[in-house]
Amino acid sequence: MTDSAKPEVAGLSFEKAVAELESIVARLERGDVALDESIEIYERGEALKKHCETLLSAAENRIEKIRLDRAGKPQGVEPLDGA
C-alpha cells in the first residue's frame, strides 16, 4: 500500500486498526521486509497501537454499571470503576 493509499490512522475504526496492526506484526515476524520498510511499518504500527489504546480508553469511560437498590431493582447507573 502506498503512502497516499494508506488511510489516516485517526480515521480508522478499532477493528480496522487492529487488523492492520496484526498484518504489520505478521510482516515483521516473517523477517522478509527490507530495513527501511520495516522501520516505516513499525512506526505505523506504533501509531495504530496508540490509536487503539485511545479508542479502548474512550470505550471504557462510556461503560456504565447499573446501580441496584436494596431490593435489587435498577436505580440508575454509575461509572464502571465506581468513580
UniProtKB/Swiss-Prot annotation:
The keyword Nuclease applies. Its main location: cytoplasm. SUPFAM superfamilies: XseB-like. The keyword Transferase does not apply. GO terms for cellular component: cytosol; exodeoxyribonuclease VII complex. NCBIfam families: PRK00977.1-3, xseB. Bidirectionally degrades single-stranded DNA into large acid-insoluble oligonucleotides, which are then degraded further into small acid-soluble oligonucleotides. Belongs to the XseB family. Heterooligomer composed of large and small subunits. This is Exodeoxyribonuclease 7 small subunit. It comes from Rhizobium etli (strain CIAT 652). The lineage of its organism: Bacteria, Pseudomonadati, Pseudomonadota, Alphaproteobacteria, Hyphomicrobiales.
